[in-house]
Amino acid sequence: MVLTIPTIASVAPVNCELSLDSGRCIKYVATRNSNPKNHVAEELPIMRKNSHQDHHDDWEGVNTICHTIDNIVNVEMETDFFDGKSVLEIGFVTGLPSVYAFENGAEEIAMHTMDKTSLELYCRPTLKRNNIPMIKTKVSCGTIEEAMKFLGGKKFDIILAPDLLNRQEAEFDLVHEILHQGLSYDGICLFSCRTHYANVDGSLTAFLQLVKRRREFEAIERWSSPRTDIIQQKVFQLTRSLF
């Protein structure tokens, strides 16, 4: 086995920007060229030539979430969507959705990532670069089981979850429980995902079947990449079931 050791240049944090169709720009900190896009438009993501998953795929999930919430605020004109709301970011956590939420009126933001390195090198610096007060933020890292402890019984108005389903299907029950425990009664969760993944057995179909079986949430598709993509990107909305 040959182990590939990351170079300093490949992990060094640099200042980046992601511009949105509305004209808004999210400033963030990440590795150079980690995000394949610096502008998000309606045609994202890049058309697939094959089904192989690379390191850019997680960022496509971030881009689609940012595109979706920007569309909600500036196209659907729900300008008060984040006003006074508590926001939780989980999944592939970068801080970009949280920054957008805070700059659009969120009262507080929380982030839980599985990677301590990304938390310290990229997520915290992203919050600092955008002058988000520490008193308004709560961050942690750890396993998906530790995410439940991080919630501590708190309910959030909005959960933003890029690439939420990029995991083994065996973890879906716990993911569902985190959403169930963490989302307020009248809250909304937006998650992005691929329809399926090359390296894990989790899939959108399996998760939606779980949601239907548990009957805690109603799932609505908010956005989809073209059907010509071999593996589509999608954004789904979850809200509490009324019955």
UniProtKB/Swiss-Prot annotation:
GO BP, sorted A to Z: epigenetic regulation of gene expression
Disulfide bridge partners, by residue number: none
GO molecular function: histone H3R17 methyltransferase activity
Gene Ontology annotations for the cellular component aspect, listed alphabetically: cytoplasm; nucleus
Protein name as it appears in the record: Uncharacterized protein F22B7.9
